[in-house]
Amino acid sequence: MSDAEATAPRSSWRFAGRDEDDQPSLREVNSTIAVPSSGVWFRRLFAFMGPGYMVSVGYMDPGNWATDLAGGAQFGYTLLFVIMLSNLMAILLQALAARLGIATGRDLAQACRAYYPRPVNFVLWIACELAIIACDLAEVIGTAIALKLLFGIPLIGGAILTALDAFLVLLLMNKGFRYLEAFVIALLIIIFSCFAIQIFVAAPPAGTILHSMFVPSSEIVTNPAMLYIAIGIIGATVMPHNLYLHSSIVQTRAYERTEKGKRDAIKWATTDSTIALMLALFVNAAILIVSAVAFHNTGHQDVAEIDQAFELLSPLLGLGIASILFAVALLASGLNSTVTATLAGQIIMEGFLRLRIPNWARRLLTRGLAIVPVVVVTALYGEKGTGQLLVFSQVILSMQLPFAVVPLVQFVSDKKKMGNLAIPRGVAALAWVVAAIILVLNFKLLYDTLFGVG
């Protein structure tokens, strides 16, 4: 095979050859974004800014909206501490994912394929694909609800229309990865702005907010209903596909592939994801705060559905466009999640199976598998069934989480894989504690959901 043949992009469905095992993740965009090796800190941070914001999208999807709305409506500001705690856990795990990708030059899926036997990898791949479909399911539902609220499009029609976003992703990818990142960041700014306006109008008590965010209430664990919502918030926080995604897209930066260059890249990539996840913290906290002010404080504690919140926000907050801002933010969230789910699906399929397929085929396949259940359930059971399907998608994501968290913490703790860039023992111990907490709470959420507890 000539050099030209080896580097030329291929659009057909095929399994990569053995000679391509060392090919980087997302090789068409790997090392395509220049980074300065010196200069003012802001220029260097700006060069690395992007992957963290793409990852943060998964922390604001419709599954998070549902739990935050319910938490604020039922329990006021009390669960803000849980949102803060879950966000700190996410910051740690995403930093580890970035470290793995930069230190080894492999994404999490490639690292799993190299380490585990084939049967284990097959199980991991199936679990990942189910998680991608579940994530896409939430995005289809969220986008369809937003289209209905804004334009009156029926849920079934809105769900079918979401297939068109496949072409948006392809257009942006063809223009360059930086354009894709810019699109995501622009939509994040829209989401942030919508909730900043609503927070300003709601005017919550700052002292109470800060106290609830940093001082936990014993009621969180003594009140079964509150504990159930708290587990739901944590369970919906760390998206398993985000760990695969982040370990890959940090490699789009053309940092020096030396130990010094990698250490520098880890520092800036971690800074990028930490700032982006603080934005996600604001959005999730804002959803809960607005819900608490508009619903909990006005006797509407039973509000749990997104469309209920839309109907009540404007009259309760006294701002005519409050409901519109809410729906616009939901639409932006759904569109954004589309981009990251597409990339994660490509990374997982190439990493585990070495199967390379055209981006348009990957997108339409994943989105098609998500649209079908939404259309069928909506046709048979109406909008209530769609809401239950949204909850079910979060349960599927919870089931997949162990298959991403455990290998990640195992790999970044391994000096044979990471060399001098392996995490220190103290960080490893903390990571295992965080992993254990998330796994236990997710399994409890799964049990409670299946058996009707809470």
From Swiss-Prot:
Residues covered by region (Disordered): 1-21
UniProt-recorded Gene Ontology molecular function terms: cadmium ion transmembrane transporter activity; manganese ion transmembrane transporter activity; metal ion binding; symporter activity
Keyword Cell inner membrane among record annotations: yes
Record keywords, A-Z: Cell inner membrane, Cell membrane, Ion transport, Membrane, Symport, Transmembrane, Transmembrane helix, Transport
BP-aspect Gene Ontology terms: iron ion transmembrane transport
Residues that span the membrane, as ranges: 45-65, 78-98, 122-142, 153-173, 182-202, 220-240, 275-295, 312-332, 368-388, 389-409, 426-446
Keyword Membrane listed: yes
Main location: membrane
A Gene Ontology term for the protein's cellular component: plasma membrane
InterPro entries associated with the record: NRAMP_fam
Family of this protein: Belongs to the NRAMP family.
NCBIfam families, alphabetized: nramp (TIGR01197), Nramp_1 (NF037982), PRK00701.1 (NF001923)
Biological role: H(+)-stimulated, divalent metal cation uptake system.
Protein name (database record): Divalent metal cation transporter MntH
